[in-house]
Amino acid sequence: MFYEEERDTWMEETVLFRFLKIRHPRPAAVLCWILTRLNGRKVMAEQMKKERARRLFLIAFVLFTFANGFGGSIISNYFKGVYQVDSVQRGLLEIPRELPGVVGVFVITALSGCGNLTLAMISFCLYAVGMFVLGLLSPGYLLMQLFVFTYSLGDHIVMPVRDAIAMDLADEGKTGTFLGKYRGYATMGSMAASLLVFIGFRYGAFWFRADRSIVPSFCVSLVVVAAALFFLWRLRREVPALDVRKHDEKKKGLPLKKKYIPYYIVTGVYGFQKRMRLVFAPWIIIELLAMGADTVAFLGIAAHFGSSMIAPQIGKFLDRYGVKKGLVLESVTIGAIFLYAAWAVHGITSGVFTGRVEQIFAFTAYIFIMIADHFNAVHVMLMKKLSDSPADVMENLSFGLSVDHVLAVTVSGLLGAVWKFVGPEWVFVLGAAVCLVHFGVAVWLGKRA
């Protein structure tokens, strides 16, 4: 409708149309009707093209998430099954696996001449190369670390690039909704992969063994990434304008600014809280309840199912109420979840909860903590709100990812010491306490407005 009104206004301002309207009103009306219809069809065609681009985007990146469920998500089991690593070696292997999260920002900056879709294709290729070597060539221990770094670099570059492409594809005022829709579909892909991995290992279709040169699950990951790469290539071919990288030619290096500090702080807090999701939430099940990986896998499937419904609602909330209220919601919700987890853990360790009761509280705490990860969409929208131009968004998203990883790695030992010497429940109390930062940023946004 907007485009038709714009065309009518343009026609009325032209000398020819005013002449026809005065001298020959009926032909002028016919001409107006024809041009309006033609313009309407053009707008409809453009909208259909954009909708097709969204579908290709969703297929490509959901497939990539699905592939990651067969590869990077179970890499710890690969280390143990194939290389029989001890706890010290496992800790050191976090360096090649997490270092790409820190250096990814510099790689993206160095490839400033590449468009977002080209960067995503490079990322998919890096991931595929890593899965190919690890899954088919049975590398030695040192070479294995190199290709763990390779696949992980691809995985980490994808994160900010994916969000930047999603924001380009979203309609005005619907960015949160589209991000939530993508995250919901991606979570369903992760859930399907988790279920298939569980079945595959339970019935012998998949394995991690030192005496076998082939890793079947990694081979599946390789094939799925190749399919995702195909759909991404089609997206770049059909919508080449989407591959134009937004950056300021006059500025070199990272567009870091003082006004973006609230985003960096919120992202750092997210990195701190991510340790709860990746390390200490599983420890509730594994260490406190002495349950195995199959229990964690089933709980992961339940968490993915819940996330697939929650993530789209978070996106819609952001579009309707804005980033400020989104940060308040994040602060209150995650704070409540961590306090609930602390209460449950205290009950388990003190012996107040036993049997089925302790399992119910532990399982629900684990699921809630996993679902809370989807509030990361609030941080993406915060960066978009603060940015001076679209050129700043992706580079700062990648820098925020680096801040997230640096803090996540540095606090792991501290939180482990708190768990062991102070008490497991205090780890989650700290996670709840830092939620005040989100509330503080929300207050700052209100004053700034």
Model regions and ranges:
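Cytoplasmic membrane-interface "Motif A"-like loop-to-helix N-cap segments
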Residues: S112-F124, R320-I334
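Multi-pass alpha-helical transporter architecture, strongest
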Residues: I108-A110, G135, V224-R237, A341-V345, ...
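Short amphipathic helix-loop junctions that connect adjacent transmembrane helices
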Residues: I74-V88, V279-V296
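C-terminal ends and interior cores of transmembrane alpha-helices
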Residues: C125-P139, T333-T354
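Juxtamembrane intracellular "pre-TM" segments in multi-pass secondary transporters
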Residues: R41-E51, L235-G271
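Glycine-rich segments within core transmembrane alpha-helices of 12-TM secondary carriers
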Residues: G180-V197, L401-V411
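Helix-to-loop junctions at the C-terminal end of transmembrane segments
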Residues: G104-N116, F201, I310-V323, W419
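Intracellular juxtamembrane helix-capping segments at the cytosolic ends
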Residues: I157-A170, D373-D388
